[in-house]
Amino acid sequence: MKKHIKILKKKLKIYNPKLNEECGVFGIANVKDASALTALGLHSLQHRGQEGCGIVTFDGERYYSEKRFGLVGDNFNKEKVLDNLKGNFAIGHNRYSTTGNNTLRNIQPFFADTNAGGIGVAHNGNLTNSIYLRNKLVEEGAIFYTTSDTETIVQLIAKSKRLKTIDKIIDAIFQIQGGYALVTVSYTHLR
């Protein structure tokens, strides 16, 4: 653990031993108006992150995603925005960047297609071995789009040799270290 913290201090210059609020994650399943309820859930977690917010929904056939800078109440307060996020399943995220740059591409949830189907992922906390895992994945040919350690989780899920999405998630969890919360949404969870 000390080794990973030392690496974070040296390479990323982001380590802050003082208590800071961090991201908030929310998930809801099999309800009408999942996007609106997720926006309300994120609003109740607003104190945990105010840089950006995002929601990924699933309607049984496809995924929908919306990510924006700023507060939940300013971004998910219009019916049109919420109506575009169709589905009865949703995950959401409030961003407070502890790792990665404050850019739109780092706002979660992230979505990826894997050989087992699509998956949406949101996480809060810090992965103490994210630099090691990221370097290992890059050496193995992975291409990263963001500077967020959450993408490391997505890459581990996608790269897993397991056949079922839930097994891919478990495989990824066994590789990451640190304190975190994780929510996912996937079609294969519904079967």
Positions of the model-derived regions?
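Conserved short alpha-helical segments that host acidic/polar catalytic motifs at enzyme active sites
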Residues: 1-191
